[in-house]
């Protein structure tokens, strides 16, 4: 395998540390409200029970009366502890906690290896949230497991793909948009399917089988595969050598080999125009690539990345990416990987891989390709943010675009857009695949 090193569009270290002092003003002089542990526990429970509702009232079905959220929280504290907190005290406590979360978020964003524009946008995103939303988002992240990565059957074409999910118990309104992923109030994580070590050949099917399956193999429209190339496996990982014969490995993200059946549903579709702004718009960007085609070569992968590594990092830790592809034809492929922040390319790596004939199919393996320094630093900074919702806020504007082409013909073989959130599941890294369409 021949590979080029990572190349940067601009130095990640050029970001300034100023530009957000206006958000800091007025925060540091506020006294931090401290409640006794029993009251604080009841307060946190109530936050999870009663979602933020603005100036609207909540009707209790057993009483038929309307209450403001803070009043309900105060009632809950009284019932649980026998101690009184007024709705004004609840409101003040929420504001104090929100300011604390904002400070933590600002410190985390400033520590990230991002340019100033990216930092400002991230801070503006936080500034658009109310105190109740900030505090409740933190509570829900801690209380409930992440959403099961199952697709919604329908989502509005006008909704923004990247907005935050509705809070517990809320229906999305004009200012609350929907992701194309289910957001159950009490998500239940389904068991993961067993890993399969085999996969179907990309060789043409016999005439009888072809007619029985409409001339298409089962993996067509059910996996990341165009008519020319199929992704078999993809992983990003950290590896630490314990001794000469022992390695410890942690997977940040992983797509394993699968062997779909005709009974499996085809991939759901996402309109490619919803994510144009998350990837470069210049020459070679997602929009230009899609217009060039072929349309069956474009896919979106949503990763829930596992950052909860139990491996102790050391100076010899290796960060890498491995991928594997298969084709019915012998080709030399070129794999371009672009790391993007706020739709702008930060670094790019281009690798060349040659075909190896295995069991009647041509296989391409990129094994242990080193991660760029930008990505390694990004992971380190991300892991040090104190809250999962802060990590996800940063990841909303972080994407990766992989483009696989034929080196000789320059034909586009496969385009994969990667987007990310943080997994809190005991199952570790998870993913869901969509095909990109343009209706």
Swiss-Prot record:
Expressed in embryos as well as in many adult tissues. It is found in: Nucleus. Residues 1-34 are annotated as: Disordered. Transcription factor which plays a key role in the Hippo signaling pathway, a pathway involved in organ size control and tumor suppression by restricting proliferation and promoting apoptosis. The core of this pathway is composed of a kinase cascade wherein MST1/MST2, in complex with its regulatory protein SAV1, phosphorylates and activates LATS1/2 in complex with its regulatory protein MOB1, which in turn phosphorylates and inactivates YAP1 oncoprotein and WWTR1/TAZ. The gene is Tead3. This is Transcriptional enhancer factor TEF-5. PROSITE patterns: TEA_1 (PS00554), TEA_2 (PS51088). One of its GO terms (biological process) is positive regulation of stem cell population maintenance.
